[in-house]
């Protein structure tokens, strides 16, 4: 069944910035997808096409991307008469229409919106759920399905919040839960106790939340953040059952080969900046003191040697995000140089569902884990909930248990777990090996 109509429009993400929504019509009806956007974006990501007209939307308009869907991609898809279930063929057609290595002509935000819409339409044509369709595309096992461990970003710093805290995300992971539903309850309880502690220690405004729903108190150091998180976990009685993860996002504070943990201070003293080896020592001190099971982006996106040196010294999950940008060439290099052991997969970093699936399988084939991720500028579209189940990744991060654009993904996972019943398992402590369960 081919596509009969393609239409894009401007809608708004969770930060109030314009983004692209795409609708596709087939004989089965109308299907819709909305594209997210990031705040701390890697320089190697596919291009999110923005208008750049400072007089409208502060330069963040997406009218060019919308027009590219309506005037170039849509007509080409309809003319091609490609069946909606030909995901790879449709994605390859759009990549060919763009003709660049980073989707800078048409925009990854234009191409991805169509790609995700096509998957929804194809699942409907086949009469199966979206996660089952994605599993078919990825040639992933479906017996049983794996429900992921949620890594809740409960405390925000870095580019996602005000205050002086350099590191961007402090996450909790209910690995000791017996189900996703229980993980949600545990996460909710810890999050609310953390909010209470933040207000008690830093004042009423400390309960205000950042872009991803986590509290954003005016904290100075990672130790201050981790002490408060561990206290909240212990208050709930979940010691040993709820672990911790960190996303440093250090590319924003990488300067002249060193790392400036005081980068938010306008007159930061260069003598206090850390060398890669000193930063490694700092990470090791945190790993010894706190129940940390996952470190994302410990080093900057092109500091390859520091990544590979650090991986040899730890036995926790090391996630590559800005380093790899869901890009198969960079993933291959990271695998070859032994820089990490887990891929963070973001759909809009690469721009099509087909390439995202290929990136996940590339990581799995190397023995890596894969974590599915939202973006800081999110929408109500829950596509990544189906993606993480379809790919058997075993882990997802979609912010805190706050803000509806974050809960849209978690609530969809609750529905999927309930629907599957005995035909699914919760990844739990084996979150890194979801594809092997």
From Swiss-Prot:
CDD domains: enolase. Its EC number is 4.2.1.11. It comes from Saccharomyces cerevisiae (strain ATCC 204508 / S288c). Substrate binds at residues 160, 169, 296, 321, 373-376, 397. It catalyses: (2R)-2-phosphoglycerate = phosphoenolpyruvate + H2O. One of its GO terms (biological process) is glycolytic process. The keyword Metal-binding applies. This is Enolase-related protein 1. Pathway: Carbohydrate degradation; glycolysis; pyruvate from D-glyceraldehyde 3-phosphate: step 4/5. It comes from the Eukaryota. One of its GO terms (molecular function) is phosphopyruvate hydratase activity. Keywords: Glycolysis, Lyase, Magnesium, Metal-binding. Mg(2+) binds at residues 247, 296, 321. Pfam families: Enolase_C, Enolase_N. One of its GO terms (cellular component) is phosphopyruvate hydratase complex. The active site is at residues 212, 346. Belongs to the enolase family. NCBIfam families: eno. Its cofactor is Mg(2+).
């Amino acid at each position: 069944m081919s596509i009969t109509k393609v239409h894009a429009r401007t809608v708004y993400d969770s930060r109030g910035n314009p983004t692209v929504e795409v609708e596709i019509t087939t004989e089965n009806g109308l299907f819709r997808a909305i594209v997210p956007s990031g705040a701390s974006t890697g320089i190697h990501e596919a291009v999110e096409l923005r208008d750049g007209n400072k007089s409208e939307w502060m330069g963040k308009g997406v009218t060019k991307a919308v027009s590219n869907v309506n005037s170039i991609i849509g007509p080409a898809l309809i003319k091609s008469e490609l069946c909606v279930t030909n995901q790879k063929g449709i994605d390859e057609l759009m990549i060919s229409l763009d003709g660049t290595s980073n989707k800078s002509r048409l925009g990854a935000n234009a191409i991805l919106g169509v790609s995700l819409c096509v998957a929804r339409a194809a699942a409907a044509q086949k009469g199966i759920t979206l996660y089952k369709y994605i599993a078919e595309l990825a040639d992933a096992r479906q017996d049983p399905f794996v429900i992921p461990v949620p890594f809740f970003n409960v405390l925000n710093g870095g580019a996602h919040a005000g205050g002086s805290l350099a590191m961007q995300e402090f996450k909790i992971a209910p690995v000791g839960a017996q189900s996703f539903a229980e993980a949600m309850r545990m996460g909710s309880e810890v999050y609310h106790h953390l909010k209470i502690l933040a207000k008690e220690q830093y004042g009423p405004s400390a309960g205000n939340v950042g872009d991803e729903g986590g509290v954003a108190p005016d904290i100075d150091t990672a130790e201050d953040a981790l002490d408060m998180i561990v206290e909240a976990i212990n208050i709930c009685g979940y010691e040993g059952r709820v672990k911790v993860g960190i996303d440093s996002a250090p590319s924003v504070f990488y300067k002249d080969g060193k790392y400036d943990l005081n980068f938010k201070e306008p007159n930061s003293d260069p003598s206090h900046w850390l060398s890669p080896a000193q930063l490694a020592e700092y990470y090791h001190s945190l790993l010894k003191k706190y129940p940390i099971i996952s470190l994302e982006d410990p080093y900057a996106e092109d500091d390859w040697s520091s990544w590979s040196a650090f991986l040899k010294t730890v036995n926790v999950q090391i996630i590559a995000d800005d380093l790899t940008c869901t890009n198969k060439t960079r993933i291959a290099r990271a695998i070859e140089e032994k820089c990490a052991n887990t891929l963070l997969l973001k759909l809009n970093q690469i721009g099509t569902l087909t390439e995202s699936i290929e990136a996940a399988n590339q990581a799995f084939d190397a023995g890596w884990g894969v974590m599915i991720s939202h973006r800081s500028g999110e929408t109500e579209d829950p596509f990544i909930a189906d993606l993480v189940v379809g790919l058997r990744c075993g882990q997802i991060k979609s912010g805190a248990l706050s803000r509806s654009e974050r809960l849209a993904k978690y609530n969809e996972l609750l529905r999927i777990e309930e629907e599957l019943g005995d035909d699914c398992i919760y990844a739990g402590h084996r979150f890194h090996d979801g594809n092997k369960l």
